[in-house]
Amino acid sequence: MKYFPTLLASLLLFAPFTGSAAADWLLRSGKGTELLKDQKISGSVNLYLTGGDRKLFRPDPVKFNAESFDVTVTANGCDLKGWLFVADKDGVWFQSEKEFLLKDGKKTVLSVPLQAPGRNWLPSGHTESWSGRIRSAIYEYGITLCPADPDDSDTPYTLTAEDPVFPQKKADGTPLEIIDWQLPAEMTQNVMVESRFNLNREYFNPFDPDEIEVDFEIDDSKAEKRPVPVAKRFHVSDILPRVTKTLLPWEERPMAELELQYEKTLEKPEFQRYPAFYGQDFLRRMHFTEEITEAVGLPYWAFRYLPKHPGEVRLRLRVHDKTTGDILYSPFRTVTVKASDARGPVHVSHKNSMYFQFANGDFYYPVSMNIHANTDRRSESIFKWGMLPDRGTADYEDYLNACGKAGISMAEIWMASWTYAIEWDSARKGYGGNGRYSLANAWRMDRVMQLAQKNGIYVNLVLDSHGKLSSSSDQEWGDHPLNARGTFAKANDAILDDAEKFWSDFKAWVSNSKRNRYIAARWGADPHVFAIEYWSEVDLVKNGSGLYRRGWLQFWHGQAYLDIMPKLQAVTLHTTHVCGVGDSTHHYREICIDPPEFTHVVSDAYRSPGIHMADQLRRHTRVLSYGGKPMVVTEFGGTSGGSSQQMLKGDVHSALWGALFSGQGGTPALWWHDFVHKRDLYHHYAAFARYMEGLDLLSEKPVFGYRKTTLAGPRYQGFAHQLKPVDLSEDIIRRAAPAPSAFFHPFTYGDAIAHSWMTLGDSTYCAWLYRHEQTRVLPESLDELPLVTGQVIDFPVELRHGDYAVSVYDTFTGDVTHTQLIRHDGSIRKVALPPFRLDTALKIRRIMSK
C-alpha cells in the first residue's frame, strides 16, 4: 500500500464551497498543489477538499451524523488503486482500511462507513483510533490514488471526481446502554479511584452537559452531609442592589434572570451525585527537547471517587441523553472500602483557623513554590539565560522531583494557555474553541498531578489568570475563545465583543460553568489538589477596579463558587487572588477576605529593595489577619520585575523563616521557581523542612514576638528597637478591626540582629535570630562575614517548670549543631547561643517524663 499523508493541512485556507456550486477538488502531488482540471497525471496523488477557510471552521454535525463517506470517481488511462482519507484541523490523518480498484474508463463509487468506532479507518502517523471525535472534526478529506500496476507508474491518466456525499444515518431505536463498566470491588480510604466505562452512543460534543450529562451517584449512609450553598451567605443582598443600579446598556440580560440563576436552589437528588468526564489516553515521548503527546486508542467515559471512610458503599451511574431525553441508571454496585492511614484532603483546621490540617487531623504547613510555567520568558531575560527549551511535562517532572526531595509540599500550577488550560483558541493545536476541550492538556494535567502525588506535593490549582481578559496587562484577550472580534472568532464560536462583558453575560457564565464542571469531574476528587484559586490577579482584567466597585466581581465569584462547590468531592479550599501586597488584598476584601465561603487569603509579597522579606511578611500578617483565615503568599521574589540574584537568594532564605515566625499559614511561593532550580537553591527548603519536623501549630495556638538590636562595636552605636509581641490567637484576630494603618515600616540601624520567636502553649519555644541587613541581600560568600558571638536569649519564664532540651539548627542544612539541657524552675535564666555568621534557629522543648 502506498499513500502520501497530507502535511500542513492547517495552513491551507481555501474556500471551495459557494452555494450549490460544485466543489473545487485540489490535486496534491510531487509537483505541488493545484486545482483538478483536465490535465494528465502520473504516479501517486492526493485528491482532496478542505473544510473551507480555516478561520471559519467548526466541527460539523453533518459529518458527525453521516453514515458513510461516499465519492464517485472515473479514471481514464490505466487502472488505479484508491483509498479515502480524512484529517482534522491539526492534521490527524485517517485512511480507509479498504482499498478500492478503479477500472480504466469505468465510474467507481468509493464508500466507507463512518459510524463504527475503531473500525474501517486506519490511523496514519499516529496511534488514535477512529471515533466520533474525528468524525465531528473532519476538516479535509479526499482520495489517495496510484496506478494499480507498478508498470504504469509513468503512464499518464486523467480522472474525474464528483462531489462527495455524506448520507445521514437514521435513528434505529437502539436503547441507551452502558458498556464495560470497570469498578474495583475494593478501595482504600482517602485514596482516589478512577472507574471507566463506555456508552453505546457517541455525541457530537461529549463535553456539553446540555447534550449528554453523565454522573455517578453514591449511596453512603456514613457520608458527611454536604451543606447546600445559600446565595445570601455570599452577601447577595448587598451586591445585587449595587449591580442593579449600575447596569450598562450592553448588559442586556434581565437582572431578574441573573438573580434567579444566582439564587437557584440546588437539585437535591436522593443520593450524592458528582459529574463524570470524557477522556482519552495518550502516549508521550521526547524528541530531543520537545515533548510529543499522541492520542492512543478510543476515548472513554470515567468518574473519579474519593472514599472517605471504611465500610461498604454503593455506586451507580446516571446517564442523561438530552438529545433524546433518555435517562439511564445502572444497577448499584457495592464496594468495600478498607481503612488506611492516608491523610486525605487539606482543610482549614478546626483547632486553629489560621492554619491547615489534613482530613485525618494531621497538621499541614505548606512549604510552597509557584510553578506557573515550565519556562518563564522574564527569567530568561532577567537572569540572561537565553531562551530555554519548552520540554512540557518533562520540565514539571524535574521541578516536582527536586521539590519533593527538598521537602517542598505545595506547588501552584496554572491552567494557563501556555500550560494546562483545557479551553482556548481553535488556532492552537489540540484546542477547539468555546466548549470543546483539549483532551491532550487534560492528560498532561493528570500527569502533573501524578508527579505531585509521587513527591508528596499538593497543588494550588489556578483556573484562570488576568491576561485572558486583558488587552494591556499580559494581554491574551485577542486569542480568547470567547472573543467575537478575534481572528478565529467563528471557529471558536465566540460570543463576547468585549472582555468586560465576561462577568455579566449569561452565555459566558454558562460556558464557564460547563468548563468548571469538567474540571471538577476530573480533578475535584483528587486529595492532592490543595485548593481552587479562581483567578490570579483578577483586578488586572479589563476595568477590574470598575467591575469591583460596581459589584460584578463579587457577584461572579459568588456564582462560580455556588456552581462548582457541589461538584467537588475532595477540594474544600477556595480563594481568589489580586495583584499587589497586603493593602491591595485588603482593598479587594469583598472577594479576597470577607466571603465566608472563601477559606484562606492569598496575596503577593513583592517588595521594594530596602524592605526585608521577613518585615514584609509581618506587615502582611498585621493587615490581613483580621479575617481569621490562613494567609499564604503565592507570589514573591524581589520586585515584580525581578531583582539582583543575591537579593533573590536573601528572599528565598528569609521568606521561609519569616513566614513561620509571622503567623503565615504556609511559606510564600516564589515566582522565580526556575531560579531556584537552575541555581540549585533547594537546600534552603530542605533545611527549613527538617526544622519543621515534629512542630504542630494546631495543638497550641502560637504567640509571636519580635525585636531587633544593633550589634555593639566600634562601627556601630548601640540601639535597641523593641516591638510589642503580637498575639495572633484566633480570638484576638477576630476582634481586631481591619485597618491599613496596621502596617509598620521597618528601619535598619547598622548591622542589626533581629530576633523572631513564638511560644506554643507552655512547653515549646521556637526562635530565629538573623543579621537583618545580610539576610535582606545575601552576601556572595558567607565565610567573609564575621562571626556573631555572645548572643543570649532569656529563657521564656512562661513555660511550665521542668526539664527542657535546647536544639540549635543550621538554617542552611537543617542539622542540629548544638544541644543542651536546662531545668526550668521559674527563675530568670539566660541561654547562650553558639556563634553564627548569618542566622540560626532553635527549639526549646519540654522533655516529657515517661
Model-derived regions, located:
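Extracellular glycoside hydrolase catalytic/binding regions
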Residues: 514, 535-692, 788-790
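Aromatic sugar-binding surface patches on proteins
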Residues: 106-124, 281-302, 827
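Extracellular ligand-binding interfaces
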Residues: 43-129, 137, 146-157, 165
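Ligand-binding face of N-terminal immunoglobulin V-set domains in extracellular IgSF glycoproteins
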Residues: 189, 274-337
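Active-site mouth of glycoside hydrolases
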Residues: 300, 320-323, 340-598, 607-611
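Low-complexity, Pro/Ser/Thr- and charge-rich linker/hinge segments at domain boundaries
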Residues: 170-184, 332-360
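Aromatic- and carboxylate-lined catalytic core of secreted/periplasmic carbohydrate-active enzymes
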Residues: 253, 628, 639-641, 652-820, ...
